């Protein structure tokens, strides 16, 4: 188990394919898109990471639990918390849905469970063999979905 808070990051480069028509042939290749590049805190060992974190949230903790669960927690000046969690296929989690508004939506073509309560909003879905979750303090449904939809594979 590793847990620490650090402001150091590494930059994830994002590329877009280009195609240029030259008449008899079309050249294709990759071009770096610096506008889409984003930072990932050092110590993050998961395969996925959100490219969008709401303004004002700063990393307070990065954890690796037995190589099965990867967590990163953020906090803003209002003491509101945001957590992104990635679990391997060998891990399992429970979501408190008692007295919650629960519905299903789609994220990246996968079914996502959304649970909204007065004190907690959770969005959980899978990407390949990983279960991903975004957890927000309070009824932060719109922000939680925006963070979830921004998650991309980085490894």
Describe the function of each predicted region.
Residues 33-122, 126-127:
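Short, solvent-exposed recognition patches
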Residues 128-155:
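Surface-exposed amphipathic alpha-helical segments
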Residues 1, 5, 112, 148-152:
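Long alpha-helical scaffolds
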Residues 1-29:
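Membrane-interface helical sensory segment of bacterial ECF anti-sigma factor regulators
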Residues 29-30, 155:
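Intrinsically disordered, low-complexity repeat and linker tracts
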Residues 13-16, 59, 153:
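Generic detector of well-ordered secondary structure
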């Amino acid at each position: 188990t590793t847990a620490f808070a650090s402001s150091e990051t590494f930059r994830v480069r994002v590329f877009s394919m280009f195609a240029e028509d030259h008449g008899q042939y079309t050249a294709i290749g990759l071009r770096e898109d610096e506008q889409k590049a984003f930072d990932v805190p050092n110590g993050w060992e998961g395969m996925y990471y959100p490219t969008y974190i709401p303004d004002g949230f700063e990393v307070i903790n990065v954890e690796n639990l037995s190589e099965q669960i990867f967590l990163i927690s953020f906090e803003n000046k209002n003491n509101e918390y945001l957590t992104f969690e990635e679990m391997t296929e060998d891990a399992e989690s429970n979501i408190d849905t008692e007295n919650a508004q629960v519905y299903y939506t789609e994220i990246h073509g996968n079914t996502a469970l959304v649970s909204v309560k007065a004190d907690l909003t959770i969005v959980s879905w899978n990407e390949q063999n990983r279960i991903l979750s975004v957890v927000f303090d309070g009824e932060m449904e719109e922000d939680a979905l925006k963070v979830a939809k921004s998650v991309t594979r980085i490894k």
